[in-house]
Amino acid sequence: MEPSWLQELMAHPFLLLILLCMSLLLFQVIRLYQRRRWMIRALHLFPAPPAHWFYGHKEFYPVKEFEVYHKLMEKYPCAVPLWVGPFTMFFSVHDPDYAKILLKRQDPKSAVSHKILESWVGRGLVTLDGSKWKKHRQIVKPGFNISILKIFITMMSESVRMMLNKWEEHIAQNSRLELFQHVSLMTLDSIMKCAFSHQGSIQLDSTLDSYLKAVFNLSKISNQRMNNFLHHNDLVFKFSSQGQIFSKFNQELHQFTEKVIQDRKESLKDKLKQDTTQKRRWDFLDILLSAKSENTKDFSEADLQAEVKTFMFAGHDTTSSAISWILYCLAKYPEHQQRCRDEIRELLGDGSSITWEHLSQMPYTTMCIKECLRLYAPVVNISRLLDKPITFPDGRSLPAGITVFINIWALHHNPYFWEDPQVFNPLRFSRENSEKIHPYAFIPFSAGLRNCIGQHFAIIECKVAVALTLLRFKLAPDHSRPPQPVRQVVLKSKNGIHVFAKKVC
């Protein structure tokens, strides 16, 4: 009796394995194809530009991303579906009424962006959802109350002055500056002093250069991964050349944050041994360590690591982006720069002292800062995965399961809500004009239930940096190297942000 085809197959396990793999692959392709058809049906009320069947709208990313948004908003006023590859779609929202409904809900972060950011930042406030997010936010909230923020102003001022001292040395040889490099080091110095009680100046000893390099590369690779649908798969990404580089920098980041935590634990042990009665200011890291010691079940070592990573990253990278673009705008528009300088000089004199009370007494400078944040919002978009259906004000609906991007850049440049959106006009934010702005048309720090917990910290640092910088330097743009905005988790420039600096007489 001849063996059956099944017996023949069983006699060749390698062939059986190949058949099994092909069957699983076919099953996955069918599943993805069915999901694609479901998404197309779900989005039939929302027209979109033609997409390649395999690459999707890849031609929009990343170089032409911001140019394309302007064209899309004219043709698709509220929102537009954008495809990344054949099976991944992001529903990009640029209408404030749409954004308002979305940001008042409690939908979780989108699966793809959540996974990519979590792979190096960890499960902290930026990536958490639900009850755990609420718990963590409650834990860190005391670190951002008004009394704490007032103390931070002195430390921020020290860091800014240190940066400006370095500028004086630099421009003696070369008046050209690349802002992001200098400002990033300054904001890291500031967050390390304010949140982690770091002694000394990072700007002088350059001990954190490796950390800055790691964050820069991890941000860049994360954005590239987001735009490459093949790299959405963890296994494919892990064995890619980018995945190998990512792993190296991620390890460096982890080692650094671990050292920050361990150093503080050792410092606290030493203080206990010395039985010192001298009171020390509690900082952000103290709050986290206290939460861990009091409730190890709800706040683990991994949670501690994640929040340290989150606040080191968010506390310096987003703020350095904001300050760099603000200084660039003021360099580009000298009449506004001079008006800010006059206002600050009248308020602060030589700038030897800047206090909490001063920050509310610079209205024109504040308007300029807001207009810069409108034009160059540090965070380009916010992602959500709809966990229940939604109906928008115009009657169109989406089912649960759709990934939504609230496109902050596009919201801030939407010609239906901003007159001449590309024009730098600080008077948009004057007292009388502010009342006319849709509350969800300007959201540089998000809005609604999950707004940025550190937004007041960021605004204070922006004001301190701008005030002290303009008192000492006149800035002018380097027209030979105009910046090229690019999204790398936060908004940066592909070729840096170059200006000329001249000492104020």
Curated annotation (Swiss-Prot):
Family annotation (Pfam families): p450 (PF00067)
Protein name: Cytochrome P450 4Z1
Annotated gene: CYP4Z1
Tissue: Preferentially detected in breast carcinoma tissue and mammary gland, whereas only marginal expression is found in all other tested tissues.
KW Lipid metabolism (keyword) present: yes
Keyword Transmembrane listed: yes
Main location (coarse class): endoplasmic reticulum
Cytoplasmic compartment residues: 1-9
EC code: 1.14.14.1, 1.14.14.130
GO CC terms: endoplasmic reticulum membrane
Ranges facing Lumenal side: 31-505
Chain positions recorded as heme binding sites: 452
Record localization: Endoplasmic reticulum membrane; Microsome membrane
UniProtKB keywords: Endoplasmic reticulum, Fatty acid metabolism, Heme, Iron, Lipid metabolism, Membrane, Metal-binding, Microsome, Monooxygenase, Oxidoreductase, Signal-anchor, Transmembrane, Transmembrane helix
Catalytic activity: an organic molecule + reduced [NADPH--hemoprotein reductase] + O2 = an alcohol + oxidized [NADPH--hemoprotein reductase] + H2O + H(+); dodecanoate + reduced [NADPH--hemoprotein reductase] + O2 = 7-hydroxydodecanoate + oxidized [NADPH--hemoprotein reductase] + H2O + H(+); dodecanoate + reduced [NADPH--hemoprotein reductase] + O2 = 8-hydroxydodecanoate + oxidized [NADPH--hemoprotein reductase] + H2O + H(+); dodecanoate + reduced [NADPH--hemoprotein reductase] + O2 = 9-hydroxydodecanoate + oxidized [NADPH--hemoprotein reductase] + H2O + H(+)
Entry function: A cytochrome P450 monooxygenase that catalyzes the in-chain oxidation of fatty acids. Catalyzes the hydroxylation of carbon-hydrogen bonds. Hydroxylates lauric and myristic acids predominantly at the omega-4 and omega-2 positions, respectively. Catalyzes the epoxidation of double bonds of polyunsaturated fatty acids (PUFA). Displays an absolute stereoselectivity in the epoxidation of arachidonic acid producing the 14(S),15(R)-epoxyeicosatrienoic acid (EET) enantiomer.
Named cofactor requirement(s): heme
Topology relative to the membrane: Single-pass type II membrane protein
Gene3D superfamilies linked: Cytochrome P450
Protein family according to the UniProt entry: Belongs to the cytochrome P450 family.
Biological processes per GO annotation: arachidonate metabolic process; lauric acid metabolic process
Domain of life: Eukaryota
Spans traversing the lipid bilayer: 10-30
SS bond list: none
